[in-house]
Regions:
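Conserved acidic donor-binding segment of nucleotide-sugar-dependent glycosyltransferases
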Residues: 91-100, 108-113
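Short hydrophobic beta-strand element within catalytic cores of glycosyltransferases
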Residues: 73-79
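Nucleotide-activated donor-binding/catalytic signature segment of Leloir-type glycosyltransferases, i.e.
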Residues: 20-40
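Short acidic/histidine- and often glycine-rich active-site loop of Leloir-type glycosyltransferases
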Residues: 79-93
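A charged, aromatic-enriched C-terminal amphipathic alpha-helix characteristic of glycosyltransferases
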Residues: 111-147
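Conserved catalytic-core segment of nucleotide-activated headgroup transferases in glycan assembly
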Residues: 1-24
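Acidic donor-binding loop of glycosyltransferase active sites
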Residues: 47-60, 73
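Short acidic alpha-helix that forms the nucleotide-activated donor recognition element
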Residues: 38-49, 70
Length: 148
């Protein structure tokens, strides 16, 4: 994926030391590694990112997928590694051998605001979330009158 998306910076963080295999990713100019990342560093990465790739083959740490959702990052995952299916739209989950489809989705949403908005809407629908105004509208229709 890194080679297929040379204009995308991949920020890869771990709260521990990184394996030699992961460290070898430093050879790519669009990869930045963050071994032994602190909570503060992780929070900064969430704030600065547009996407969260749920492709870690090990256990999820610190509710990473939920945190990505709360930071309004588009979440894309591999079916074999998806940790946060409650927050990931089914159409954003790909078989790992079908990574070119994920690459195509990344290119689509990063190059088109409307595509990103539609993808985020699908993600919000999966998580059954509402905006404040949507909640107010629903409460008003349930309660009748102007209670909100």
């Amino acid at each position: 994926m890194v080679e297929s998306l040379p204009d995308v910076t991949f920020q890869i963080a771990a709260v521990t030391e990184m394996s030699p295999r992961l460290l070898s990713m430093m050879r790519y100019s669009n990869v930045v590694l963050h071994p032994n990342a602190s909570h503060k560093q992780l929070d900064k990465l969430y704030q600065e990112s547009d996407l969260y790739l749920d492709i870690n083959h090990h256990n999820e740490l610190y509710k990473a997928t939920r945190t990505a959702f709360e930071h309004q990052l588009l979440i894309l995952a591999f079916s074999e590694t998806a940790h946060g299916r409650d927050y990931t739209a089914p159409e954003h989950i790909y078989a790992s051998q079908n990574y070119p489809a994920m690459v195509a989705k990344i290119k689509q949403v990063l190059g088109n605001d409307q595509a990103m908005q539609e993808a985020m809407q699908a993600q919000k629908a999966q998580a059954n979330t509402l905006t404040a105004s949507e909640l107010a509208d629903r409460l008003q229709s349930l309660l009748g009158g102007n209670h909100v």
